[in-house]
UniProtKB/Swiss-Prot annotation:
Gene Ontology terms describing biological process: threonyl-tRNA aminoacylation
Reactions that this protein is recorded to catalyse: tRNA(Thr) + L-threonine + ATP = L-threonyl-tRNA(Thr) + AMP + diphosphate + H(+)
Source organism: Saccharolobus islandicus (strain M.16.4 / Kamchatka #3) (Sulfolobus islandicus)
Matching Gene3D superfamilies: Anticodon-binding domain, Bira Bifunctional Protein, Domain 2
The keyword Ligase is annotated on this UniProt entry: yes
Protein name: Threonine--tRNA ligase catalytic subunit
Family statement: Belongs to the class-II aminoacyl-tRNA synthetase family.
Superkingdom as given in the UniProt entry: Archaea
Localization annotation: Cytoplasm
Keyword Protein biosynthesis: yes
Function text: Catalyzes the attachment of threonine to tRNA(Thr) in a two-step reaction: L-threonine is first activated by ATP to form Thr-AMP and then transferred to the acceptor end of tRNA(Thr). Also activates L-serine and transfers it to tRNA(Thr) but cannot deacylate incorrectly charged amino acid; unlike most archaea the editing function is found in a freestanding protein.
Designated gene of the protein: thrS-cat
Major localisation: cytoplasm
Region spans: Catalytic: 139-433
Length: 545
């Protein structure tokens, strides 16, 4: 998606100017996850045909941009995008308007929102529309509703998700897996508040350089902020007592809730929200420990993505360098950047460069993952930071008794757990691996006469912490099987009189695979192993065939 965004933004600007020429009043253009949007004042009606006519109008070769606004014929149109710039080299000619709807940025305002895409060639447009049709079939928002995983409610607030029991089960499994990964690397888990005085954001630099994302309020004469990041809190834990060179590295982890005020037009299901949980981690270490730590993080990150079935070709690291707005000296930035480059080179991974896309306090390695639809998602990050230890005056006593500054490394493997849930739902098309599925087995008694045996099978699985449920014979067997498939249940156990008398089950798995006369204890043993190993494939049914 990211590679399309520059041409989409240019297309949105072109269309906005053409709409002005037609007498309409666009007020903003921006980018969504899969398209561009234009907000138009709704004091005059606008139809799809009128928008299509405006597409073909001539447009100025060089669009006048001032202070991130299109300035044209007395109109000022805000550009709601700070990561993609307007390119004079792009010339989109092929447009598709995806929909026109009413948009309410607040209760007192109403706009017409036009969503569309633009490309330089007709072939690119056709290919994208074909891909989009497939993507819409696996939209995580539809899957989430269908499987009863999560919901959004305007009365609760835009971009604030409510996870239902089945959705929370998936999150819990992801967190449990990451806890094991963290334990294997020597992390100590911490918990920090959701709200802090803004003093720490002023020290860290977030208050100035991250101000548009901060949610702040005043209480009893003090200014507080809902945390957008966990790092300053972890720094304060480090500072809570003296540290020596023998203590380092110190590794803190937290499944921390953070909140960032994303623009309403950019919110998109779980992929772009205002409140989410990070699998965050911060390491405080000596400079001589830095290289090995980064190499370990790179290795563990790749190991995690392999566990979810992503191959080496689906994993692409990038080095993101110093942005225009940053803190710290050139010397510190160069030192941090060189450390990341050296670790990447020693890892043997091929990596790209993203100029000026580092964090404001340090360079970083970002990992992008390619899903089953060919999309690349930025997930994991490893950031080297010499600046925040300096700003917070962090210290440790070296072996020679001298106080020195530690280096700080920020890291997250999933990134946002909520966003990762969305990516997994779309990647697996709602059919999650057994260990992640909110319901792992559904028992289907053929008739009420075998309910007692079906319930014994159910209870035996639940005693072994398998997430199982039963669907009694209220509907036909074929209908109940279809319901289980549609709801992404990995395994279906069918039991009738024969199975009840022999202590067996008929096992059905995804792909319409069926295995009869399976001893229930044998199935249970194999399933426990599949779940414990967190297999991506359904290894239980493979072993039974």
């Amino acid at each position: 998606m990211e590679s399309y965004k520059p041409v989409w933004l240019k297309g949105a600007v072109i269309l906005a100017i053409n709409l002005i020429d037609k007498g309409y009043k666009p007020v903003a253009v921006g980018l969504g996850e899969r398209d561009f949007y234009i907000d138009v004042k709704s004091d005059t009606s606008i139809t799809l045909d009128e928008v299509k006519k405006a597409i073909n109008e001539n447009v100025l070769a060089n669009v006048p941009i001032e202070n991130n606004q299109i300035v044209y014929k007395g109109n000022k149109v805000s550009i709601i995008e700070d990561k993609v710039s307007i390119s004079t080299n792009l010339n989109p000619k092929y447009f598709e308007i995806l929909n026109i709807s009413t948009h309410h940025p607040n209760p007192n305002e109403q706009y017409v929102r036009i969503r569309g895409v633009a490309f330089e060639t007709e072939e690119q447009l056709k290919d994208y529309l074909t891909w989009l049709e497939k993507a819409e079939e696996t939209d995580h928002r539809l899957i989430g509703e269908k499987l009863d995983l999560f919901s959004f409610h305007e009365e609760a607030g835009s971009g604030l998700v409510l996870f239902h029991p089945k959705g929370q089960t998936i999150r819990n499994e992801l967190i449990a897996f990451m806890r094991e990964i963290n334990d294997s690397m020597g992390y100590q888990e911490v918990y920090t508040s959701h709200v802090f005085k803004t003093d720490i954001w002023k020290i860290s630099g977030h208050y100035t350089l991250y101000r548009d994302k901060l949610i702040v309020f005043n209480m009893e004469g003090d200014e507080y902020g809902v945390k957008p990041m966990n790092c300053p809190a972890h720094i304060l834990i480090y500072k809570s007592k003296p540290r020596t060179y023998r203590d380092l590295p110190i590794r803190f982890s937290e499944f921390g809730h953070v909140y960032r005020w994303e623009k309403k037009g950019e919110l998109y299901g779980l992929l772009r929200v205002r409140g989410f949980v990070q699998d965050d981690g911060h390491i405080f270490l000596r400079e001589d420990q830095l290289m090995e730590e980064i190499k370990m993080l790179i290795s563990k990150t790749v190991e995690v993505w392999h566990k979810f079935g992503f191959k080496d070709d689906d994993i692409k690291p990038y080095l993101s360098t110093r942005p225009d707005e940053s803190i710290g000296s050139d010397e510190l930035w160069e030192k941090a950047t060189n450390a990341l480059i050296s670790a990447l080179q020693e890892s043997g991974l091929k990596f790209g460069i993203k100029e000026k896309e580092g964090a404001f306090y340090g360079p970083k390695i970002d990992f992008e993952i390619r899903d089953s639809l060919g999309r690349w998602w930025q997930l994991s990050t490893i950031q080297v930071d010499f600046n925040l230890p300096e700003r917070f005056k962090l210290e440790y006593i070296d072996k020679d008794g001298i106080k020195k500054r530690p280096v700080m490394v920020h890291r997250a493997i999933y990134g946002s757990i909520d966003r990762f849930v969305a990516i997994l739902l779309e990647h697996f098309k709602g059919k999650l691996p057994t260990w992640l599925s909110s319901v792992q087995v559904r028992v289907l008694p053929i008739t009420d006469e075998v309910n007692e045996y079906a319930e014994k099978v159910l209870n035996d699985m639940r005693k072994r912490r398998i997430r199982a449920e039963i669907d009694y014979a209220g509907e036909t067997l074929s209908k109940r099987i279809k319901n289980a498939y549609d709801q992404g249940v990995p395994y279906i156990l069918i039991v009738g009189k024969k199975e009840a008398s022999e202590g067996t089950v008929t096992v059905r798995a995804r792909g319409n695979i069926e295995v009869r006369n399976v001893k229930f204890e044998k199935f249970l043993e194999l399933l426990i192993t599949e779940i414990a190993q967190r297999d991506v494939e359904q290894t239980t049914v493979k072993a039974l065939k």
